[in-house]
């Protein structure tokens, strides 16, 4: 009996979809305008299909993978259906590997069971929960001096907001962190993490001679000279720089964060070699607290994506970044302009476009939007966005009941702002706009079933019971380092 009911539900859903498509096609045909002003909506079928495997933008219809490589920008306030219409259906229907920013944890709960059934390797990065989290160590991925400098810069700028009245402190803090991370890279791998950078800062404040000895023994001449020039600062200035550095690394006083970032178990190449999904989770309330590490992760993943071209047999990689405005991603403008060449696509979800303007400035925010092939606007847009959309959609003319020619906007800003909850505007590349009908996942027989599959048991395979702190003996070496060939 259950099987018969299930089959009937599927048939009804398919029949309903066909009727909806026919109705929209006929309606669009009758509403076409062949006048001087002839703005009109396109039929969704010109870009979207149930049989594609790219980003799902309506809950049922998807872009092609090729179009998805050109990115998508989803804009809508809380509760309008960004997750239920776009994120869940995309996870249920797309192919390839995923990096998913999942602040609420809901995406993992309702998709991991199905993805595991499909053969996906499920990973979680949760800085507050070491027992289930994969390990991620930003220092281990900083291979070159420029990588180290970028990491130090992100730690300072993201943690402190880059809003210091005097940029001297942030600049010098970045330089000192770069020097300390570089000296740590000369030590055993278990000591190469930001927890131990923080320990070095503590020693500089209380026992600077021990750090002098470390540099004397392990630094090359260039690094040793840079360190000496730093400690030559006036004591008050040096204390201020150290304090700025410690504020940047304040997170690493948290034992959970220190454990998760002490080593690294995430192999970026896995995402190319087999179907893999990583959910980056932190509670919504703590999102700002953890955003430094999440931002650094995405920056380092962008470097991986843009650093090589995938082989034919390797997997596509898609990044679904919910609450993108909570992150500081300096490379994002470059990434959205170039990931298509690397068989990858980025979906950004924000509440309002002005959030991107606030983070990246007007020029870069416009660049990000321009490099997103699909731009999706849910109901409830701000007046500024709605007015801009009214101009973008254009105008059309018609004759009123008295035969007079009337010109009006395809949609006024009020009509855009007050669209029905089950409608959204899609503007894709050079194509005419689409007024899409939305179908949340829970109204789809298949997707609703997928969401109820149990979450697989998550457990970190490498349990670190303690943190490896730099041993005291390395600070006790004889400290008269001679500089070769320097007059």
Q: What is each stretch, according to the model?
A:
Residues 336-338, 342-428:
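Conserved ATP-driven motor cores of ASCE-family P-loop NTPases powering translocation/secretion/packaging/pilus
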Residues 18, 22-26, 30-38, 47-59, ...:
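P-loop NTPase motor domains
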Residues 1-29:
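Long, basic/Gly/Ser/Thr-rich N-terminal segments
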